[in-house]
Amino acid sequence: MSYSNILVAVAVTPESQQLLAKAVSIARPVKGHISLITLASDPEMYNQLAAPMLEDLRSVMHEETQSFLDKLIQDAGYPVDKTFIAYGELSEHILEVCHKHHFDLVICGNHNHSFFSRASCSAKRVIASSEVDVLLVPLTGD
């Protein structure tokens, strides 16, 4: 089976390059499309900050996340069609984006080594609820 519209869930970590490389290896032979989704930290979890500071911090975090995605795309050696930066529960956003944009494969990474950690990760929630195929890629740290 070939996949032509792939969504890659990345984190702002170097291991995300492995996920994008996997997506490129799947998409390139069929000239498929790749999009990225990531989660930006929500500064509201730092509730001791005043409201005006929260908005400034949210803007900075969004810019840093976008810069990371831009660098990841630049190094990919293959075009990336869309990027999505989500706030909140990543698995919910992945499912929503898949439905709206008709992705046929979601690629997620897993660097958790214990069974308990794997059972509680966002990827498990995506796998349980997804209407499209999900590829869980084991990640190796540098």
From Swiss-Prot:
The keyword 4Fe-4S belongs to this UniProt entry's keyword annotation: no
Keywords from the UniProt entry: Cytoplasm
Induction: During growth inhibition caused by the exhaustion of any of a variety of nutrients (carbon, nitrogen, phosphate, sulfate, required amino acid) or by the presence of a variety of toxic agents. Positively regulated by guanosine 3',5'-bisphosphate (ppGpp) and by a RecA/FtsK-dependent regulatory pathway.
Superkingdom of this protein's organism: Bacteria
Cellular component GO terms held in the UniProt record: cytoplasm
Signal peptide location: none
GO molecular function, one term: protein homodimerization activity
A Pfam family recorded for this sequence: Usp
Compartments where found: Cytoplasm
InterPro entries in alphabetical order: Rossmann-like_a/b/a_fold, Universal_stress_UspA, UspA
Family: Belongs to the universal stress protein A family.
NCBIfam families documented for this protein: PRK10116.1
Function: Required for resistance to DNA-damaging agents.
Name the record gives this protein: Universal stress protein C
Lineage: Bacteria, Pseudomonadati, Pseudomonadota, Gammaproteobacteria, Enterobacterales
